[in-house]
Amino acid sequence: MFKVIKCERVENPFYKALVENPCIRTEKEFGTEKEANEFINSDIDEYLAKHDGNDIKAIKIEFEWQVGASIKDNSRFGGLDIYYLKQSW
């Protein structure tokens, strides 16, 4: 099982006034690394257009540092801040 946590920066001035580094966090679990990588490398809107999106656990605004504790790898891709944790069980 692969768990992916992906954060997209929020440019909305309303959220920027509330928190310094707001992001939309999307968390999802996958059965294979190939499926996980497809999600990691996709734009959220494009991904949801191709899939029904019902299996996404949560989309919420939160502070960047709140997800930082479990980050294994942090990379920039296509304008997104992507945080993902690969974990097998």
Which residues does each PLM region occupy?
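A short, exposed loop/beta-hairpin motif centered on an aromatic-Gly-Thr core
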Residues: 20-38
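Ser/Thr- (and often Asn-) enriched beta-sheet segments in non-cytosolic proteins
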Residues: 1-6, 27-29, 57-62
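Intrinsically disordered, low-complexity coil/linker segments enriched for acidic/polar
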Residues: 12, 32, 54-55
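Secondary-structure transition/turn motif
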Residues: 7-10, 31, 75-76, 89
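Short, mixed-charge low-complexity intrinsically disordered segments
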Residues: 37, 41-89
